[in-house]
A protein has these predicted regions:
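Bimodal "functional hotspot" detector
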Residues: 2-11, 15-164
Length: 164
């Protein structure tokens, strides 16, 4: 009887340990806000989505990928970022996201101060909404430039502007 009770306790302990240590197949996700330009090109529209809960670098890459993918199914949103994954790359270091833009993007954007502002802050407001990112700095083709389209100083450090 003692032997059976002892075996029962040991087996129960092993099962409990195995259950506690079992890896969950469930992927943890976190809510994020992406900003898209409205159809009239007047303002940014917040769009809530879920990103895989990871470090800021991976979350920034996923958010930028979603911005590039766009919301073409929504007629209230206008695409400013071309649907080309090589047009934007990101790197996160010390709370700052470094965003490298391809100069080819300017070929698809109409020249306007408002459009440049919406384009920049669509990226800035999306990235600064990610835990661990407070600021955004831009380069164009890997080089820090004075401006992107002639209106905004790309040497600046940008932070969140548009409240929800």
């Amino acid at each position: 009887m003692k032997r059976a009770a002892f075996l029962f306790i040991i087996i129960t302990g092993i099962v409990c340990f195995a259950i506690a240590c079992a890896r969950s197949d469930e992927v943890r996700k976190t809510e994020a806000t992406l900003y898209f330009v409205d159809a009239e090109i007047n303002r940014l529209l917040p769009y809530t989505c879920e990103l895989i809960d990871a470090d800021p670098q991976h979350m920034a890459e996923a958010a930028v990928e979603m911005l590039i993918e766009g919301r073409d199914d929504n007629d209230k949103i206008r695409r400013l970022i071309p649907k080309d994954k090589s047009c934007i790359s990101t790197r996160v270091d010390g709370g700052t996201a470094y965003v490298d833009l391809s100069s080819d993007i300017t070929e698809t954007l109409p020249y306007s101060r408002d459009i440049e502002k919406l384009f920049i802050y669509q990226i800035v407001d999306t990235l600064t909404g990610i835990k661990g990112i407070r600021f955004v700095k831009f380069t164009v083709d890997g080089v820090v430039k004075k401006d992107f389209m002639g209106y905004y100083d790309m040497r600046e450090t940008y932070k969140f502007v548009y409240p929800e």
